[in-house]
């Protein structure tokens, strides 16, 4: 029986693939679970339309990410924190702090898109990568300075 996949099914294929499976597997598992539809002309057109919509959405998201990346590229921000006598920060600079400063500058970035392995705990300048889209990223410079200067 030929079916068209509506979701990615490990070992069988991805969305939009037309595969040939045993009738029982299709009727008892793939179709009831929403993984596939019988490969009729109308179902094929329906799934192809869904794929086109997803492609357009991904293209819009990429264009928006590229626009934000242009604003971010080369941007330098300063974050002031309380510092002890050894030059270590009381607390640390996290992705939330960076996202907040960017928001104040009018650039909305989700904190999970800021690639910071570990919180910053020392004074200095750091290059931080922001991954806006799987294919689009930008680098900003973050200057961490003492609050009392």
From Swiss-Prot:
GO biological process: translation
Gene Ontology MF term list: rRNA binding; structural constituent of ribosome
Family label: Belongs to the bacterial ribosomal protein bL9 family.
Organism: Persephonella marina (strain DSM 14350 / EX-H1)
Keywords noted in UniProt: Ribonucleoprotein, Ribosomal protein, RNA-binding, rRNA-binding
GO cellular component term, pick one: ribonucleoprotein complex
Function: Binds to the 23S rRNA.
PROSITE patterns per record: RIBOSOMAL_L9 (PS00651)
Classification via NCBIfam families: L9 (TIGR00158)
Residues making up the signal peptide according to the UniProt record: none
Protein name per the record: Large ribosomal subunit protein bL9
